[in-house]
């Protein structure tokens, strides 16, 4: 993502390079598995801390964990943005191979059907129009359809490209995102969800939505220009170090001048955290996360369905164990672990149904 030199790549050479090294892309599947588990644990903790509106609240006040908001804050800063980046990364090649008609059809099947079924079920159970965690699936579907529309009028870049990811380019990217997020949060603070114009059924949190759009777009560009493949070890390691330091800064917030500073400039602070920890994790998994065991292949195949199924399974489990004392942290870990296992296993069982794999 730097505006500088290295070896020259055209898009087709990038694709050829990537396809010759498909094993190297295992790290993206493995990273998505880890992100899915993190989402599940994030939601598991919401009932036991100040994590926003949740369908279940424990009857025992001793199960409340006041410290867990740090965990929520760090997660919210980057994990959905990283999901969008990874999703965007695979969009250009899928479109080029399938063409607009097949691309749109497959997205409507794989994203639209789960959205209608799970979103409809959540709405029925909540007694109001509500899609819960399926907002991500809906947004991803909208982004993909917009991409398909844009491609009808704009040809992809196919010239020589020597750009690569550097710390300076990440600083610029994070700065643009941060400034935009800062001004958005002046009128729409974090955790404020809306339906655009009050009627469009696309629930969004404006405070984070700019991040999601930018990360999806940067994923598309990263595929076009092989930015992930060309990211140097120095850039990757430094990005991870900066991202972890910024995450640690969230955990150190506990009143005082530092807390006041981060609170005042949180849109900018969070954006830098997002950009650096995302590219740092992408580098780390590229170098150390190409696990090719049957276990990881199995988990990767179920991770999408696990994201879809986990919420309702979790709420049922939380109500079922409400009267069982495990300690606050023990209950949080128990719910997270059991929900993760059940979600992945349920997806595996559903995928045994003929043609279900086209959706899940």
In which residue ranges do the predicted regions lie?
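Alpha-helical transmembrane segments and their immediate juxtamembrane cytosolic regions
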Residues: 10-11, 15-360
């Amino acid at each position: 993502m730097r505006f500088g030199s290295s070896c020259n790549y055209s898009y087709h050479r990038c694709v050829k390079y990537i396809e010759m090294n498909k094993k190297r892309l295992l790290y993206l599947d493995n990273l998505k598995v880890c992100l899915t588990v993190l989402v599940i644990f994030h939601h598991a903790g919401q009932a036991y801390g100040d994590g926003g509106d949740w369908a279940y609240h424990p009857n025992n006040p001793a199960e409340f964990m006041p410290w867990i908001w740090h965990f929520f804050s760090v997660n919210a800063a980057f994990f959905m943005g990283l999901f969008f980046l990874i999703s965007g990364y695979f969009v250009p090649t899928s479109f080029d191979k399938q063409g607009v008609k097949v691309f749109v059809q497959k997205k409507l099947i794989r994203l639209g059907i789960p959205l209608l079924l799970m979103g409809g079920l959540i709405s029925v159970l909540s007694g109001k129009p509500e899609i819960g965690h399926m907002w991500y699936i809906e947004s991803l579907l909208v982004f993909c359809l917009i991409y398909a529309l844009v491609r009808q009028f704009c040809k992809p870049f196919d010239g020589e490209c020597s750009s690569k990811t550097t710390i300076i380019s990440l600083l610029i990217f994070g700065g643009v995102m941060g400034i935009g997020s800062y001004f958005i949060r002046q009128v729409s603070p974090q955790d404020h969800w809306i339906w655009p114009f009050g009627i469009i059924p696309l629930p969004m949190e404006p405070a984070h939505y700019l991040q999601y759009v930018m990360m999806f777009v940067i994923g598309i560009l990263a595929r076009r220009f092989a930015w992930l493949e060309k990211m140097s070890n120095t850039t990757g390691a430094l990005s991870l170090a900066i991202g972890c330091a910024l995450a640690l800064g969230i955990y150190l917030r506990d009143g005082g001048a530092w807390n006041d500073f981060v609170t005042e400039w949180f849109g900018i602070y969070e954006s830098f955290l997002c950009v650096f920890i995302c590219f740092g994790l992408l580098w780390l998994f590229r170098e150390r996360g190409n696990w090719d065991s049957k276990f990881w292949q199995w988990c990767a195949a179920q991770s999408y369905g696990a994201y879809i199924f986990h919420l309702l399974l979790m709420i049922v489990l939380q109500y079922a164990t409400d009267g069982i004392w495990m300690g606050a942290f023990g209950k949080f870990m128990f719910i997270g672990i059991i929900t993760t296992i059940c979600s992945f296993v349920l997806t595996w069982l559903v995928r045994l149904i003929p043609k279900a794999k086209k959706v899940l």
